[in-house]
């Protein structure tokens, strides 16, 4: 019986059924490589530029360098790191996990993060290698013992022999430019009126707009359908109806990976959250 409950929990939390399509902020776009260089973020709306790092909004001073798997890392020209000659074993493991998550949609990273936070029943925000590997297996992601131990060692911040869950989840998110991180933070700040770092599904419902969603424009979905599909990512009988900044970032990191340019991503966020 416990096995069945665990399986149902993992399926519900993961939300990775191939037949399910998520809503807005989850556009069905191909994972195409990003342009290797963008020289200015001056396209950002003026009222959002105050949320962006100065280096990002100063025309001609920022270069977005292409990161792993075609995604971008925000770097200023003066501090662009030299490319590493090869990927170490742990980085290769992380890239494998990230790719498997993203292959299952924009909510893939968020689903994995939510599952592991639920698995952390004692609230320690840590997992040992066996717990980590078994949790991945329940989600259909397989690592051998050496790979799991390598990941745990890399994110063992206190020498306890366990993986720091939040550090691992942050590292798993697809890299984003500073412009994308800033507009995500601006959207969450608008929702988080109390400043306690938590918003409710009702908060999302009260602000979110799907009118610019491509499937609304094409007539395939109504605005209500888009809203329902989006909220399903955060609200169900297995979820608590509350959304933290980390969960919001988890979700939008997956969305970001499917959008070609910073301009496109910022425009989507501006429309969806009426920034």
Curated annotation (Swiss-Prot):
The keyword Repeat applies. Its main location: cytoplasm. GO terms for cellular component: cytosol; nucleoplasm; plasma membrane; vesicle. The modification Phosphoserine is found at residue 126. GO terms for biological process: intracellular signal transduction. It comes from the Eukaryota. Ca(2+) 1 binds at residues 120, 122, 124, 126, 131. Changing residue 180 to Q: Found in a consanguineous family with intellectual disability; uncertain significance. GO terms for molecular function: calcium ion binding. Residues 59-87 are annotated as: Disordered. InterPro entries: Ca-bind_SignalingProt, EF-hand-dom_pair, EF_Hand_1_Ca_BS, EF_hand_dom. It is found in: Cytoplasm. Ca(2+) 2 binds at residues 156, 158, 160, 162, 167. Residues 107-142, 143-178, 179-214, 222-258 form the EF-hand domain. Keywords: Calcium, Cytoplasm, Metal-binding, Phosphoprotein, Repeat. Ca(2+) 3 binds at residues 192, 194, 196, 203. Monomer. Does not form oligomers in the presence of calcium. Calcium-binding protein. May play a role in cellular signaling events (Potential). This is Calcyphosin. It comes from Homo sapiens (Human). The gene is CAPS.
């Amino acid at each position: 019986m416990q096995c069945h409950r665990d399986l149902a929990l993992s399926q519900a939390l993961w939300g990775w059924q191939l037949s399910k399509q998520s809503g807005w902020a989850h556009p069905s776009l191909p994972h195409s490589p990003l342009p290797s260089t963008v020289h200015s973020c001056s396209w950002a709306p003026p009222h959002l530029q105050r949320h962006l790092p100065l280096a990002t909004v100063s025309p001609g001073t920022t270069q977005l360098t292409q990161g792993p798997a075609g995604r971008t890392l925000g770097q200023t020209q003066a501090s662009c790191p030299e490319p590493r000659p090869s990927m170490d074993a742990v980085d290769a493991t992380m890239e494998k996990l990230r790719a498997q998550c993203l292959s299952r949609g924009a909510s893939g990273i968020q689903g994995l993060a939510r599952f592991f936070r639920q698995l952390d029943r004692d609230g320690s925000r840590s997992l040992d290698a066996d717990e980590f590997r078994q949790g991945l297996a329940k989600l259909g992601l397989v690592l051998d013992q050496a790979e799991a131990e390598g990941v745990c060692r890399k994110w063992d911040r206190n020498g306890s022999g366990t993986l720091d869950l939040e550090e691992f989840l942050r590292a798993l998110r697809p890299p984003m430019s500073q412009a994308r991180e800033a507009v995500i933070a601006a959207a969450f700040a608008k929702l988080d009126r109390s400043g306690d770092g938590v918003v409710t599904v009702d908060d999302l419902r009260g602000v979110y707009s799907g009118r610019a969603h491509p499937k609304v424009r094409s007539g395939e979905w109504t605005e209500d359908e888009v809203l329902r599909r989006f909220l399903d990512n955060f609200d169900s009988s297995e979820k608590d109806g509350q959304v933290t900044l980390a969960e919001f970032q988890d979700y939008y990191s997956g969305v970001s990976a499917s959008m070609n340019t910073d301009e496109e991503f910022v425009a989507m966020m501006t429309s969806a959250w009426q920034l």
